[in-house]
Amino acid sequence: GSIDELIECAHRWPNAADVGPYIRQEDGSAYPSARAIPTLSNGIGHALLSGIWPNNPWSKAYRDNAVMDKERVAGWLSGSCLLVRWDAFCRIGGFDERYFMYMEDVDLGDRFGRAGFTNVLCPTAQITHAVGHSAGKHPESMLPAHHESAYRFQADRHPHWWQAPIRVMLWIGLKIRSVVVVGFTK
């Protein structure tokens, strides 16, 4: 089964900190579960344009071109299903508890990469994931939570005093986006 496939994949990639499966959504489509680490530019471009221009260059860069059928290294893997190497997990201090919801898997994958490990997509292992069932019903609380996590992720990666204007603009931009998007969903 899929767990056996993940274990075999982990053996093929001895430097992998985590291995994740191909994730199928309930409608049968692939969930982009292996992506690039979001930078400021592709994160902003994706956040602003993905709803009106799904294949914009920033979303493509963030989605890592959505290649989900090839065993490969990714910046991060969806936390909905992961096989994780315990020693690697302990070495980076596990999950960052400041993330309530969203981006905890992005942060984990990024920190694995910074510690010299890889994150590997193993498409021969497959699962179905009911994406966003509870989150989709409450965008007024879930979208701000997502934005808080996105801010935390980027703020942690831009911590210097001279990067304060970036953090301020990002915080303001995400607050405005939350108000606008939640307003449109009501």
Give the location of each predicted region:
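Conserved donor NDP-sugar-binding/catalytic core segment of glycosyltransferases
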Residues: 1-34
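A short, conserved alpha-helix in the catalytic core of glycosyltransferases
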Residues: 4-6, 66-126
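Short, flexible, basic/aromatic active-site loop/helix in glycosyltransferases
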Residues: 21, 38-75
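Residues that scaffold the ATP/ADP-binding catalytic core of kinase and kinase-like folds
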Residues: 33, 43, 47, 91-92, ...
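Short, hinge-like loop/turn segments at secondary-structure boundaries
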Residues: 34-40, 137-140
